[in-house]
């Protein structure tokens, strides 16, 4: 069966999310919190635990391990420069033909850290993902901020 998509423009095939997150924590603490939150402490919708494996080196995988050799590859680490950059490329949570790039750029700002987040994608982005992706990243990025700002135990 062949399905045509009349009237599909470039804007229907692209996705761009940009967010700035101001964190009251050092650059190093914020970067470590980012790796933790995107890895073992990741959460899905409604705050449910969804731990991920994040191999934080160039070419490292970022994936959800479901056990028994099952899982879902979200992407690969395209670039990492501790503690100022981590960049991913891959399908992320989308199980259809899409190329995504996710960037976290960190810089010192007023005694804290500024995270500049950017998710750009190209391909057959389903409408449900288009609607939910901004809020989803907002939740993840807020959890990164909360983790970085929490008091350190002695």
Which functions belong to the PLM regions below?
Residues 85-104:
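Mid-chain, well-packed structural core segment of small domains
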């Amino acid at each position: 069966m062949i399905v045509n998509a009349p009237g599909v423009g470039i804007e229907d095939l692209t996705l761009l999310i940009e967010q700035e997150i101001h964190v009251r924590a050092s650059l190093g603490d914020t970067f470590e919190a980012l790796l933790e939150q995107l890895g073992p402490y990741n959460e899905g919708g409604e705050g449910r635990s969804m731990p991920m494996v994040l191999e934080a080196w160039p070419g490292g995988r970022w994936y959800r391990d479901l056990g028994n050799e099952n899982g879902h590859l979200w992407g690969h680490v395209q670039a990492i420069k501790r503690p100022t950059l981590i960049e991913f490329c891959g399908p992320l949570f989308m199980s259809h033909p899409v190329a995504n790039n996710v960037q976290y750029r960190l810089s010192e700002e007023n005694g804290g850290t500024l995270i500049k987040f950017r998710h750009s994608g190209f391909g057959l982005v389903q409408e449900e993902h288009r609607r939910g992706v901004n809020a989803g990243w907002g939740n993840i990025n807020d959890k990164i901020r909360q983790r970085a700002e929490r008091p350190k135990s002695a």
